[in-house]
Amino acid sequence: MGPFVRILQVIHQFPPYSSQGSEVYCYNLSKWLSARDDVRVFHVSNTARRRPHRLTRETYDGLQTLHCVDGGEYSRIADWPNAFLREAFQMALDECAPEIVHFHNFVSLGDDLVSTARASGAAVVYTLHDFGLICPNMYLLRTDGKLCDKEDPEFFQDCCPVLVRTNGGSRPVLGARVPSLARWRVYANQQPRPALRMALKAAVGVAEQLGGDPAHTDVARKRDFFMTQTRRIFRDADLFLAPSEFLRQRYVSCGVPSEKIVYTRYGMRPFSRVAREGATERLAFGYIGALHAQKGVELLLEAFRGLGDRADLHIYGSAFGSPISENYWRRINDGQETSVVFHGAYDNQRIGAILGSLDVVVVPSLWYENSPLTIQEAFIGGVPVITANRGGMAELVRDGVDGLHFRLGDAADLREKMLHLVEHRDV
C-alpha cells in the first residue's frame, strides 16, 4: 500500500438521508480517516425518487459518496438478491479501486456484495453493528417480545418468518409495489387511532387467510436459505470487528471463526459538554436515539409516569419521515404530561449541548444491543446512564459506578432506579 489507503465504506444509509447510530459512526470514522486516506462511501436510499435505479456521485461534509438510488421498499433479507445493487456496487469498485472495503450493514444491500468485494482483490472488513448475520430480525428479539438466546447456527425458530423468503426468485410486479404483509401488520399495530388500527389489523388478517400465513411456512427451508447466504459472508470477509465482547461471543458460537473476529470498542469523536447555566430543582432524564419499538421508549414513558412532577424527561429522536415511527410516537405519547418534552430530530454535532442539559441518560432497550453509541457519548459528556442489565448495555455500564442497571423490560424496576436518583441527587 502507498502513502495513503483507498477505502470504500459500505452502509445501508448515510447522512443527510439518515443519521442513526451506525450511520453516525460510519460518518465519524470516514471523516477521521479522510484526513490521511482516500475515503469514499457507498450507500443506498430506498426513498422513492422520480428516477430510481441510478448511481449518483454526491458530497456530504467533504466526503465523496456514491449514492445508490433504488426507490424500492425493502424488508431486510427478504429482498436478496438485488441485481441492480450488485451492478451499481461493481461500478463503485471499478471507479474507486479500493484497497479496503469496509462493510457496516447489509440491510437493503443484498447478500452478495461481500463476495463481490472480495473478488475485486480488496481486503474486506465487516463491523458488526447488530446480530443481522445470525438473526433475520437483526436483534435476537422474537416477534412475541422475548429475547432469543441463540448460540447455535442451526437453531432457527420461526419467530420472524415474514422477513425471510424461501427462494431467491424475483417478486411479481404487484408485489414489488405493495409493502409486504409484515410491514402492513407493523403499520396497523402502531396506528394511534383505535378504530383505524382495528380495521387495518382485520384487513391484514383476511389477506393472510387468503394468501397463507407466513408463520406456517417451512422453518427448515428458511433456515437453509438464510444460513447459506450468511455463511458465504463469514467465509469471504477477511476480518470482523465486534464492538462488544457479548456480540463477539454470539457470532463465534454461530459459526464465525474466532481468529477472524476481533473485539474492539467503537472509536468516538471527542467533544466538550456544554454545561447549562444554574442548577435546576427537577432532575432531567434524557432519551437520545431512534423511535423504534425495540428501543424501549414506551417502557421508559411507563416508568416515568410514576415520578409525578419531580423530574423532566427529554426525548431526542426522529422518525426520519417514516410513517411507522411517527405513528408509534403518536400512540405511545397520547395523553403524556407536560413534563415529557419531545425535541424531535437532532444534529449529532450538538451532542455536547444536549448532554449538558441532562442529569441522567436512560437507555431502555428491549433487545441486547451491541455497544450503544449513546452510552459512550454520555460517558464522554460525564453523564451517568441507567440501562438494562443484559447484553452490550450491561457490558458498558458498571452498575453503581457510572450508572445503574434495571431488569430488562421491567418498567417498575426502571421507575425504582429513576426514583432513587430523584431522591438522592448527590449519588
Give, region by region, the residue ranges found by the protein language model.
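A conserved mid-protein helix/loop that constitutes part of the nucleotide-sugar donor-binding site
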Residues: 24, 292-306
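Short alpha-helical segment that forms part of, or immediately flanks, the ligand-binding pocket
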Residues: 352, 370, 375-380, 394-395, ...
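Conserved acidic donor-binding segment of nucleotide-sugar-dependent glycosyltransferases
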Residues: 399-400, 404-411, 420-426
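N-terminal subdomain of nucleotide-sugar transferases
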Residues: 1-54, 61-64, 94-96, 120-123, ...
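Donor nucleotide-sugar binding/catalytic pocket of nucleotide-sugar-dependent glycosyltransferases
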Residues: 133, 153-273
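Glycosyltransferase donor-sugar binding loop
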Residues: 312-329
